[in-house]
């Protein structure tokens, strides 16, 4: 039992309810997880529930708002793929390091379903090592068209005028 386990089970019960309703197309279920911890349960739920056709897990699997921007040139070898100890207990998934259970692998397990790899702030697409991995995974399935992205602007330490701080998936993030 864990907080993430409870959250994922709650989301799966929500999907059960949706698909039990008349008029709901069970093949078009989308799970979106906004920033500040919502992306984690959205990503894990989509990974364990194949009824999810599209997932939009914000800030889960790759660089975090706290990551340097732009990413360093040696990011392939210097990036912390395990993530740091976080105050958000959903990010500290049990068994991540010893089991090789990296967040990007959870996100990658969604292939070949549709994924929007989403970031709250500016995103260094060219150097993001996880984006490169996700592109490879979706290409193995010959489903590159099922992989998209969304991102905001500015940095974590900016103000509302210079950065897309949010607690939901805002208009700036819906411009892919």
Residue ranges with predicted function:
Residues 1-36, 52:
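Gly/Ser-rich "nucleophile elbow"/oxyanion-hole loop immediately N-terminal to the catalytic nucleophile
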């Amino acid at each position: 039992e864990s907080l993430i386990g409870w959250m994922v089970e709650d989301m799966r019960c929500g999907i059960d309810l949706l698909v039990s309703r008349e008029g709901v197309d069970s093949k078009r279920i989308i799970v979106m997880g906004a920033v500040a911890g919502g992306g984690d349960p959205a990503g894990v739920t989509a990974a364990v529930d194949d009824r999810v056709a599209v997932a939009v897990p914000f800030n889960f699997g790759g660089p975090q708002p706290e990551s340097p921007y732009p990413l360093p040139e040696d990011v392939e070898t210097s990036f912390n793929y395990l993530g740091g100890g976080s105050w958000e207990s959903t990010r500290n998934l049990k068994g991540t390091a010893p089991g090789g259970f990296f967040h990007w692998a959870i996100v990658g397990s969604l292939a070949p379903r549709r994924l929007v790899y989403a970031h709250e702030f500016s995103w260094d697409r060219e150097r993001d090592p996880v984006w490169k991995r996700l592109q490879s995974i979706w290409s193995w399935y010959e489903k590159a068209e099922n992989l998209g992205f969304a991102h905001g602007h500015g940095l974590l330490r900016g103000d509302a005028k210079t950065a897309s701080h949010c607690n939901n998936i805002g208009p700036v993030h819906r411009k892919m």
